[in-house]
Amino acid sequence: MKYFVTAAILLAPLFSMSQLFDEMLQSFNTKPILTAKISTRNSFITNSFMRMRDVGVGLNFDNVTKVGLGYNWLATEVIRPLELTNQEVQNNEGELKMRYLTAFIEYTFLKKKRYNFSIPVQVGIGRAFFRYQTISGNNQNTKPVTVAFYEPAFTAEYTGIKYIGIGLGAGYRLMLLGSQKLDDNYNAPVYLFKFKVYFGDIINDVHN
């Protein structure tokens, strides 16, 4: 856990490193509660618009640090040029398919009654391939390529409805593996919309 926290600190230089480290470590001394999220991230692949969706579950430590796992998938049709050796491709294009698992950590550095500001960071690894049609009209998939991403961001969240958080943010997607084999530029700004459910608060209220 300390190594994960340290990595997040190194990638969030806008804030005091020692304060960030201390607050995160102190939050891990509290009893965690369950948290879940659904988010949408809009971005680009070279000159093509793309939308990623993700769902995640994790643990919330004192509303300061959240850690967990997520599943991400490409939710829009992204058509890219495609040429294959020994295979004729209809229109010389294919549809990108991509999905990956992520580990995420989120540090909330400012909390008010109805809103908060956070630095979420996620690292993901998964697979991508192209689905194309042959000249005869058959659907085929290219060989899957391993992809890996690092995605830091800055988000603002509003909790006007009890147990529910709605947020907006911006960040950057850095592709660590796969860009050369996919022959495209996946490094790009990311614009986020997220929906979060505070299950821990629900459970606490039910028990009380």
Describe the role of every protein-language-model region.
Residues 155-208:
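Predominantly the C-terminal beta-signal and adjacent terminal strand-loop region
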Residues 32-34, 49-53, 97-101, 115, ...:
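Residues that define the transmembrane beta-barrel architecture of outer-membrane proteins
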Residues 64-137, 158-160:
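Gram-negative (and chloroplast) outer-membrane scaffold detector with strong preference
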Residues 48-50, 80-85, 129-138, 178-185, ...:
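Outer-membrane beta-barrel translocator domains and adjoining extracellular loop/strand segments
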Residues 40-44, 71-77, 123-129, 172-176, ...:
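Transmembrane beta-strands of outer-membrane beta-barrel pores
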Residues 18-67, 196-208:
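Short glycine/proline- and aromatic-enriched beta-strand/turn motifs that initiate or cap beta-hairpins
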Residues 1-24:
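Bacterial Sec-dependent N-terminal signal peptides
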Residues 32-38, 67-69, 101-103, 117-123, ...:
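Transmembrane beta-strands of outer-membrane beta-barrel proteins
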